[in-house]
Swiss-Prot record:
The gene is rplV. The lineage of its organism: Bacteria, Pseudomonadati, Pseudomonadota, Betaproteobacteria, Burkholderiales. It comes from the Bacteria. The keyword Cell inner membrane does not apply. This is Large ribosomal subunit protein uL22. Keywords: Ribonucleoprotein, Ribosomal protein, RNA-binding, rRNA-binding.
Amino acid sequence: METRATLRGVRLSVDKGRLVADLIRGKKVDQALNILQFTQKKAAVIIKKVLESAIANAEHNDGADIDELRVKTIFVEQGASLRRFTARAKGRGNQIRKPTCHVYVTVGN
């Protein structure tokens, strides 16, 4: 039994998200939440919310026991980049790319 939760279009770079996702892959859910709580990264807060959503989905939809759940898969994929322009000298402009990503978490026995 597997349950998924996704979060799309997060204002976070893929590399920073994957750094935190690698910390909890394959761990028990309570251990993963503990790791995320004490990790001082912006990505940890975002991934913790998605993980809590996946746990709630498993409990509500499938009646799963929380003590037996593990983080089966977690991956962070690249989303569309937001493009912004900033003014430069002599009437020119430079492009600023603000990356987004998609977070996918699957929990199961």
